[in-house]
Amino acid sequence: MRLNKFIAETGFCSRRKADELINEGRVTVNKHEAIIGMDVKPEDVVKIDGERVKLNTKYEYYILNKPKRVICSNEDKFGRRLAVDFIKSRARLFTYGRLDFMTEGLIIISNDGEVYNHVMHPRKKLYKSYIAKVSREIEDKDIEALQHGVVIDGKRTAPAKVKKIDKKELRIAIFEGRNRQIRKMLETLGYNVNSLKRIKVGELTLGNLQVGEYRTLNEDEIKYLKSL
């Protein structure tokens, strides 16, 4: 098994992050510094920053309805609440498909490092759906603009799927994952975003979860996630 895949399957981090750690010289195999692309066996001793990592025997998969003012990270120097803190588990958990500090809604949390490749890798083009409430009435020309792509940070966005729900509310689905993308898309068109909530990732939905609640994925959802 490739070392980066081994590290991902321990739940420590994604394959991409594992390669970064290897390049930084923070990974050893049997007391020797690791190199990119090397293979390891289950009995090999793999350490990151001097701490051994082992393959998980059981993976856990959750969906959290993230509240506002919660961080999608495993640490925060300002002491703000973390999304993983909502989950009652002893496993080392990570969030996949980040939401910014003021956005609420569906976030996937797991100790399976391979989730990154299923959900977040750019080549997947997995649509994520949001409900946005804005400061003024939404004009039809702006819906068309979103559907064709708008320029943010000097680069045009991919076409979005957009449906007007009410005068100041719309549903928008995108497959890109640029920083604060939907907020920036709407701000570029002159709208202030009053609230933003993610309701769907691919075919995974919040269901009846209230803000701050979570649930485990069922078998069909896990199979779907791994099929992506």
Please annotate each region the language model reported.
Residues 1-228:
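Basic, flexible Lys/Arg- and Gly-enriched helix-loop patches that mediate nucleic-acid binding at interfaces
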